[in-house]
Amino acid sequence: MAAISRVIDLFTSDQEYIGKTVRAQGWVRTKRDSKAGVSFIELNDGSCLRNLQVVADQGHPEYRQLLESITTGCAVMVEGSIAYSPGKGQTIELKADRITLYGTADPAVYPLQKKRHSFEFLRQIGHLRPRTNTIGAVSRVRNRLSYAIHQFFQDRGFYYIHTPIITASDCEGAGEMFRVTTLDAQNAPAKVPEEVYRADFFGKPAFLTVSGQLQAEIYALALGRVYTFGPTFRAENSNTSRHLAEFWMVEPEMAFCDLEGDLEIAQALIRHLIGVALQDCAEDLDFFTRFIEPTLRGTLETVAFSPFETVTYTEAVRILKESGENFEFPVEWGNDLQAEHERYLTEKVFRKPAAVIHFPRALKPFYMRVNDDGNTVAAMDILVPGTGEIIGGSQREERPDILVEQMRLKSVAPEDYKWYLDLREFGSVPHAGFGMGLERLVQFVTGLPNIREVIPFPRTPGHAEF
């Protein structure tokens, strides 16, 4: 009996399979019956965008009755021989000798048919949307980028560490965290006093992590170079195309590293990941360029092969104010840059990716290193055309006295972070790191307008299916 062959392997090595007996399995995208007594079945197994055309003789004694039951959405296994295809759009086809029907799909109720469905509709059937061309392609791109992230850091001597999902620390200081508790939610007071916290599972307030950075610093100051890659959570009531309540972050931390070294690694990571996508996901990117964003491939090539522009926050504000552009959000020194400002810089001014450095001290969290001017911190944002910020990072404050001052300015209690201050008391060194959201990266690489399409199970305000 022939081994099961993936569709992608049949297309990649098509010459090797001509005349050979193979078995392919997957889900039926379409079936077309011709007047010549032949049925054409488009079979997809998820391994690639292309469908394998199965040619089935309607009078074949092995499966003639079975053919009537095969409709869009059915799961089948087909055994037969590979032959050159005379039709347009495919090089090979599978001439069926035997068909096994694993599972049927009633065409009267199966929601995916041969037409373009809106993304809003597909989100309502999240358990079936991976079977569409778009979400299948997104999944393959996401997989390849995730693997490439590990490759990048492993090849450069970073150690992969696992930081906690449940934490008592708020890295961002914004307070928008999901609380973890075993207390009775129906009778919990609005403000829980300390004695009630002590009755909780951990004996103190605990939350889902917003970042693994602080914990990663612990290991960077022992192993030198580390990274963490896992889910993070924000209880931010933002119902936009750029925000999720649950998403995946990659966060490297490097000892003996300043802002310049941080920038170097961040830019190298972006170039590496975009280069991998262009090389290894070409078919899927062609699909996105054709159906989602016509300028996608050109934008990706610009980011992969162009030098990054570097400007200070102060310079960026000056450029924006002098542009004469009518922005929705006013541009003033001390205000955070919005997506429209970031895109204007990369798309209209520099026409390539950019790094903005040295942000106002008041805008950034307590852990960022204060510059000598006392007004700015050694922070950086990496911006790309079409998206805006894709990476944010900084050199970390390694001086204990200034770190305590920063904490007090940001209303962070130093006594709650004694362990973090200890890292500055015992063998402190300059160190730096950054965070990159995987979904923001996948959204950029695929050109999809809404971030909810690039994560398998989007978590947003009012939505937590599955």
From Swiss-Prot:
- EC main group: ligase
What the entry lists under CDD domains is as follows: AsxRS_core (cd00776), EcAsnRS_like_N (cd04318)
Localization, per the record, is: Cytoplasm
> Keywords assigned by UniProt?
Aminoacyl-tRNA synthetase, ATP-binding, Cytoplasm, Ligase, Nucleotide-binding, Protein biosynthesis
**Any GO MF annotation of the entry:** asparagine-tRNA ligase activity
**PROSITE patterns for the chain:** AA_TRNA_LIGASE_II
GO cellular-component term (any): cytoplasm
According to its UniProt entry, one GO biological process term is: asparaginyl-tRNA aminoacylation
Gene3D superfamilies from the entry? Bira Bifunctional Protein, Domain 2, Nucleic acid-binding proteins
Q: Pfam families this protein is in?
A: tRNA-synt_2, tRNA_anti-codon
Reaction equation(s) it catalyzes: tRNA(Asn) + L-asparagine + ATP = L-asparaginyl-tRNA(Asn) + AMP + diphosphate + H(+)
Q: What is its EC number?
A: 6.1.1.22
Self-association or partners: how does it assemble? Homodimer.
What family is this?
Belongs to the class-II aminoacyl-tRNA synthetase family.
According to UniProt, the name of this protein is: Asparagine--tRNA ligase
This chain's source organism reads Syntrophobacter fumaroxidans (strain DSM 10017 / MPOB)
Name the gene behind this protein: asnS
